[in-house]
Amino acid sequence: MEGRVKNKAPAALQISAEQILLEAYERKETPLQQTEQIADLEELAEYQGRKRQEYEGALRRNRLNTGQWMRYAQWELEQREFARARSVFERALEVNSTHVPTWIRYIQCELKEKNINHARNLLDRAVTLLPRVDKLWFTYVATEETLGNIAGCRAVFERWMHWRPPVTAWAAYVNMEKRYREFDRARGILRRYVTVHPGAPAWNKWAKFEMEAGNRDTVREVYALGIDTLVEMAHGGVDFLDESLLAGWASFETRHREYERARALYTYGLEKLPKSKSAKLYADYTAFEKQYGAKEGIENVVLTKRRSKYEDQLKEDPADYDTWFSYITLGQESGLEADQIREIFERAVSNVPPHSKRLWRRYIFLWIKYAIWEELENKEVEKAREIYKTCISIIPHKKFTFAKVWLLWAKFEIRHGNLPEARKILGRGLGMSGGKPALYKGYIALEAKLREFDRCRKLYDKYVEKFAEFAAPWMEYAELEQMLGDEERARAIFELAVSQPEMEMPELVWKRFIEFEAEEENYDRARAIYRQLLDRTHGHIKVWISFAQFEVTVPAEDQELQYNDEGEAEIEVTEEAKARARSIFGEAWDALKAANKREERVVLFESWREFEEEHGDDKSKADLDKRKPTPVKKKRKLEDGTFEEYIDYVFPTDEEDKSFSKLLENARKWKLQNQS
């Protein structure tokens, strides 16, 4: 009894089986491996033969395994069998001559064994075969330079340059010449470099070189030549001109106390380059003027140049409305007087475009900006009203109109307490435009904000009468009545909408009608609408599926709805709802079967199966599987006498019906024979 454990509480430190296994694995001892001893040349030859057979066997199974080739060659090198190693490398290159790591390993092995000529031959072969692989060229030039063969290195670089390589190759060539103080050669290379890569980075690199190896005049010549070249490439434009080139030149002049030269360069850049491409240049110029000039001087210079640029552009194309917008914004931001800004506005709106609505869109926004500026910034209410009137008078309303202008004018009058005038404006707009949908919507939204719902109804009556073929006005009208709590009026509007003989996208109205009845908890009415829609669409498959899915969402009469955090009702699917949905699926199945719509039945089966996966049990799933169609390939004869294959479906229930019908027919024949 004394040996019995009295404290049966769990130990403070619990050890799991996983910990035991992990500790055992970590403490396992490495098995001793017997070192293979080779006693004589015969054993060595046998060992080498065996290893070669292993490598050759592996390569016969997979010749494309480049790693295996290189391991084979490395092993031969370890055996000091250089001829065999070369043979392995050559065979590997025959399999894949474009594999760069194989070339590099082959070359490195030759260099390691000090077989210089072999390595040179390999490098020459490699760059001849793969002239676009920079790594091979870099290896080649590094080898020649390491060997002290500068002339040979230069010759390799020249061969490389004929292929117009990337900028890193040119930079390496220039740096090589700089290391040996061959500045004239480096300068010649840079001339060719900017020809092949004529961007701003190349010119900056050349200018930086001249700062180290040349003098001020040569630096200026390089910068000037670079800017002239880039401008000429763009046929006098600035598409290729980069702010870094101008900023670098200006910084160079600043370091040498040539402040006027630097200021001229900054001014030139800000004048020529667009704002999106001159942010750094402007920042540098600001810092320059803070240190060496006056802030007012900067702003005046920049604004003057900008205005000059806009004026030049507008002389070429007075109808460039984007430039007019930029010009007006510049005037507002620079603090021009109101009369000066008004003059720019008047000049802009005087350029009336031809009667093309595409061109008029930007033009109309000039008028809108003008009117808003007069009203809100200048507080000139009468002037703003005159602008709206003038704008309306010049629009060719017989061809097109702009609902936005009418609505903004009406809102302007409302802001200034003139509601009757606003209604007159919108009524006039509807009359002159023939009733644009956007104008109807804006007018109705305005009256709704004012809580004038009777006026909204009158407007909707005209709206749906004018655009009876559109679904949107009908749905918006019904939603208004639903919001006002008039269920009967909303239902009447929906019924009138679905009775329209022609309508674009009528399915939207039907869908919203069903949702309306569901929201009002009139589920029997919703079912009746589905039946009506099935008659209208001749039993369309999508309607059947939607009908079945709807039944799942219908709660039981005594069911209490639960609401989530977002206020949405969460309905628990009852067995009664599942039964109703299955009934609809079954009815749809029979209807499609009677109409011989096989493909639609397949779609219905997939939807039914998804329903059963989510809501069904084993029995319902098994019952549905009995209906599963089987795809079969069949042939049919075309009009030209040829045959084509197509996929048909065989339904098990159809085959059972055929078998049962045949059984009844045989029974009838047997009965007739017995009676006779």
UniProtKB/Swiss-Prot annotation:
Q: Gene3D superfamilies recorded for this chain?
A: Tetratricopeptide repeat domain
Q: Where is the composition biased (Basic and acidic residues)?
A: 616-628
Gene that this polypeptide is encoded by: CLF1
What is the superkingdom listed in this entry's lineage? Answer: Eukaryota
Q: Is the keyword Thylakoid in the record?
A: no
Q: Which UniProt keywords apply?
A: mRNA processing, mRNA splicing, Nucleus, Repeat, Spliceosome
Q: What is this protein called?
A: Pre-mRNA-splicing factor CLF1
Q: What does this protein do?
A: Involved in pre-mRNA splicing and cell cycle progression. Required for the spliceosome assembly and initiation of the DNA replication.
SMART domains this protein is in?
HAT
The subcellular localization recorded is: Nucleus
How does this protein assemble? Associated with the spliceosome.
> A single GO CC term, please?
post-mRNA release spliceosomal complex
**One BP term from GO:** spliceosomal complex assembly
For this protein, the record's Pfam families field holds:
HAT_Syf1_CNRKL1_C, HAT_Syf1_CNRKL1_N
Q: Where is this region: Disordered?
A: 616-636
| Stated family | Belongs to the crooked-neck family.
Task: Please list the residue ranges covered by the HAT repeats.
Answer: 46-78, 80-112, 114-146, 148-179, 181-212, 215-255, 257-291, 301-333, 336-369, 379-415, 417-449, 451-483, 485-519, 521-553, 576-614, 620-652
Q: Does the keyword Nucleus apply?
A: yes
